[in-house]
Amino acid sequence: MSVIQLVFRLLCVLDLLLAVSASGLHGRNRTLSHEYCVLGAGPAGLQMGYFLSRSQRDYIILERNAGPGSFFNIYPRHRKLISINKIYTGRRNKEFNLRHDWNSLLSDRPDLLFQRISRKLYPSADDFPHYLSLFEKELGLKVKYGTDVGRIKASDFNGHQGYVLTDQNGVNYQCRVLLVSTGLWVPQEVDFRGSDLVEGYESIPTDPEEFKDQAVLILGKGNSAFETAQSILGRASRIHLYSPSPVRLAWQTHYVGDLRAVNNELLDTYQLKSLDGLVEGRLEDIAIVRRAKDRGKRRAAKKRNSTSTKRNEPLYLTLTELLDDQNDTNISNVTGQNLPGYHTDNFSLRQPYDRVIRCLGFRFNFSIFDGSARPPQSSGARGRLPGVTAWYEGRGTPNMFVLGIAAHSRDYRMSAGGFIHGFRYTVRAVHKILEQRYHNIAWPTTNIPISQLQSWILRRVNEASGTYQMFGVLGDIILLQGSHCEYLEEFPLQALPQLSALSGRSISDHGLLVLVMQYGLNHTDTLGPGRAESEWTKAWKSNFLHPVLYYYKTLPTDKDMRQRPVGWPLPRPEAVHHMVEDFLTEWDQPISHSQPLRRFLEHCLKTDLRAFYAESCFLLSLTSRNPPLFCRQGYLRKQGIMGNRHLWQHAREAGLMEDAALSEDASVPEYLNHAGAAVISTVNFDL
């Protein structure tokens, strides 16, 4: 090889190295621009990605881990989901079945349901990331994995406030709209003396043998606390749960975030006096300490696998006010006089513990937001969540929307917004708001003749899954327009004063109706006698989930919303109608459900909404200058079901029509053949 060739090759290598170096430096400072940035590829992020993809918007989903739903790779620690996967409902209606499918995301693919992955009623947590991966790949969503966003700041985006997200490689992502779907993953902690001796739910061993013959104190009384207790129930010598509030049972409160029956076995051993128990007290007032005389000692009956001597030293719960020096950080020099048992000899938690475990849930990660983009902490949920508006936009952070469990502050302890079967619908609602605000595409509506409104409402209360799961939070809005109405599905109720701006739909002088699913306000024994109301004349006393209709002549204002009665989802209306609760959740009976609903609608609309057979419409059209609305909007427009031998035979056998209605040759009268016979139900409303 000549010297010239050698020099030439060296120059080529040097040029290549310089190019790679320049590319790397350039990559650290490059900026990628998108209309929408979705932060987090969990269920809420992928759900929004689906809607953005279907609308053909410019978006990117940024995920710090290597796959979707990474939270479920770790939690729940004992790998059993408590979200219902009820496959068999006796129905084939896909919308109805979503009422009892708490794990699937929404899509136009009927085969893309969670039951494709698992058939268990309470599935394994390992199945959920698998389902999310399937959802992402089969729908072709745009997800960029391995992108750990460490800083978010506000910036100008074409004259409007946008956001810049910076990842671990220094790459900037500039977006017009930021959609935060990071979930809750930062462990909730309480600062008290000795908190460093406490183990966290996120790091405890999951092998029950690790707790063999140990006394365990668990801080918290939520599902994670009871899940942990249940896993060691057959191994630990005693388990005590300690928190400020008494345990709340989901089957009493109707809130799925409260203690579920699938996790409550410890209540048996507590109430049947088998060494386990629940105690209430403020966590901020306690201290976890070691007694000086116990230092270096090991109890023979409490040997543990750990080689740490300190871990084997007994731990005591005491009150900060009993310590000699409340500012002393040394929690190992405590004497018997510093323990509650010295002052109250029957103090519930006077015996020592081998382990203290923190199971206090999780909080939102505020640390990645700088001052220009940081949403405020919520007033509820102990500030664990970001504060958002009624349409899920961050307070003080325009064009930043919060999705999923992080937006649960809007319905905390009230509805299912913190869970997949709830926030899949709020994500869809947010997408409709985005379409109106940024693309001038109004909220989808269905134009319905007033004569068909009752039937449409009955269909929704018997099938709709969004209003059923997000009861009291999402509702159907019916904009009355005279002879017809516009029907908006699943609108955020607390945003009702902003309906026109958020939906792009105007309110007429005829007013509006709002359809809501809600529980009763009376707190009754949910398993006791008289727990349910079956008399339709007392429907307003219903305790369990049931439909409620609100009628307003004008759109409620922000002031009306703030001053609404306690426990009401909406302000006081002009008129209200409760459909009596139903054991089967089927509101389709003529006397208890249909007729009272029709009477209420007639009262609000000042219109006769009775349904008539085609023969009656024919006679009324000949004898009246103003036939009923049902006839004008149906029969006189040649609408309805064409009569045939089968329909007429059914009507005769059901006693709806006289035998004379069928001629000897069973042919349909000529005028009915021409117009069509409307067959609406098994009840003749021609009365």
UniProtKB/Swiss-Prot annotation:
Q: Where in the cell is it found?
A: Endoplasmic reticulum lumen
Provide the record's note on post-translational modification. N-glycosylated.
Give the coiled coil ranges: none
Q: What is its main location?
A: endoplasmic reticulum
Signal peptide from the UniProt entry: 1-22
Q: Name one Pfam family in it.
A: Pyr_redox_3
Entry cofactors:
FAD
A cellular component term, taken from the record's GO annotations: endoplasmic reticulum lumen
User: What is the protein name given in its UniProt record?
Assistant: FAD-dependent oxidoreductase domain-containing protein 2
Q: Which gene encodes it?
A: foxred2
